[in-house]
């Protein structure tokens, strides 16, 4: 293995590829925690402006994606008992010190599919839900969700 740049490596093997985001690239949480220790998160809507750069917006985007994927949107159900939501809730709560995530269902969720350059109905294509580091990197790292540009 040979080092090219700081925290970047290259091998002559194509068998394994991975991207590692060092913990020092994760920003301190800016998510607001209410008096009950909860992080209140709403859905991304059709009117949301891109790019999504704030931790709140990226978490909202992730929650909205999971809401659609779980089928809760189509059944008009709460997502509080959804397995993937519970995983995200645990990861974010551990990182922030919150007691959990409370979803605000008052806004109609909606993702402007034409505005997002990398939109895919399968949330797992852009963040591995079961990988704590991937979720934390998505929400607290430098990644952003940007709009599509021709």
Please tell me what each predicted stretch does.
Residues 1-8, 15-150:
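Long, non-globular targeting/processing and low-complexity regions
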